[in-house]
Amino acid sequence: LKGLNAELNGELPVLGFAGSPMSLAFFMIAGRSPNQKLAEVLAFIEEQAEITQALLEWLTVMTVDYLNFQIASGAHAVQLFESFADVIPLEIYKRFVQPTHEKIFSALSTSAPSILFTKESPHLDLMLQSGASVLSVGNCIELEQAQKQAPEMIFQGNVDNKILADGTKAEITQAVQKCFEQSGRKNHILNLNHGLLAHTPFENVQHFVNVAKELGRIEGVPHEDVHPKN
């Protein structure tokens, strides 16, 4: 990150990230990609609660150290990914996941903002209690309603990544416009609902960025002055 910041010379911010303790635990319990073994992983968590708790506590300590190292190395912000939030039952989320979020965000350096991403954001009320500076939300969350619920919170999202992958440029423009309208252009970071899909055309990503820059300009402030500097 230090080398990247030197190369960028303050022109762009650098975002650090880490998988959440539960996301890492899913991979460790499955022994490989857990997507085909979700039921088995969830059954293990419930049946082996003490082992799961011990594993999550160890991973939480490691995650805090890892993210703080990234901040010390020059990350302007860090994001924690809860990649399987959409399949985790509420009781498991409350018992095992939420405590890791609260411990991590309370232990991070305050010199950089922190972002919490939970896939499709099924538990917004709990996300708001995590201690993160920013919440990255999925398609199931209406930005307008989220901001009414928590007017001081900064939300990130939530253009559908499928539109970028398979949509026309006109559809991408419309999606960005809708996202800005829902957010009211206040306390909002434009982004996707999730990562880029593998088959997303570069031209569509470029168009998304160009439209975001054009529609997201702050009145009276040149776009190049909006980025944080070192």
Residue ranges: model-predicted function:
Residues 2-230:
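Active-site loop segments of alpha/beta catalytic cores
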